[in-house]
Amino acid sequence: MKKTAKTDTEDAFKFRSTFGEHYYDGYGARHETPHIVAYTGEVTAAGPGRVLISSPLGSCIAVCAYDPGTRVGGLAHVMLPGVPPAHAETGKDRYAAHALETLFSVMQNEGADPGNLLICLIGGANVLRREHDTIHIDNLRSLTSLILQRNLPICRTMTGGSERMMARMETKTGRIFQTTGNNPEEMLFDYFTHNIENPDN
């Protein structure tokens, strides 16, 4: 099965997958499904049978996009709002606008319909607890505006606060999970049933 993880510091797509290995979720359950990690400023997409995971999120936000029709999922680990500087040659996917363009492009390459995508957002915390630090707020505003401009629904968000977060998406089941701080992993959203496990969060 084809897997794509892209960073714009390289000309070609960069593959970040681990075959036959395992990881443990917040409940200590062992998972054998190969997974792909999106680190800061990276974008990844894959079809059914893969698990997409963000590295820890502070003020960064994980954009988790999914096409239920093809079971193609994508994850962008966004670091900064807006567009990259005009002179930037690398690191463009750290910025919200460029990261979304890359995300939708690589998902389409995997067979997704760009008009059929459902979105969840995770992260955007003020982990340093600085009173005048607004980067986490700016990231959320930038991404929300750009996504709504494309008339794509934002189904669920888990943003804000002061604790690090992580995102995990199962492309086969259409479920997205989030971890906050040292707490156990929780299901945030089911892209097929639209069920929310923790509606009061």
From Swiss-Prot:
It is an enzyme of class 3 (hydrolase). It holds the Pfam family CheD. Its EC number is 3.5.1.44. It catalyses: L-glutaminyl-[protein] + H2O = L-glutamyl-[protein] + NH4(+). InterPro entries: CheD-like_sf, Chemorcpt_Glu_NH3ase_CheD, Cytotoxic_necrot_fac-like_cat. GO terms for molecular function: protein-glutamine glutaminase activity. Keywords: Chemotaxis, Hydrolase. GO terms for biological process: chemotaxis. Probably deamidates glutamine residues to glutamate on methyl-accepting chemotaxis receptors (MCPs), playing an important role in chemotaxis. Belongs to the CheD family. This is Probable chemoreceptor glutamine deamidase CheD. It comes from Chlorobium luteolum (strain DSM 273 / BCRC 81028 / 2530).
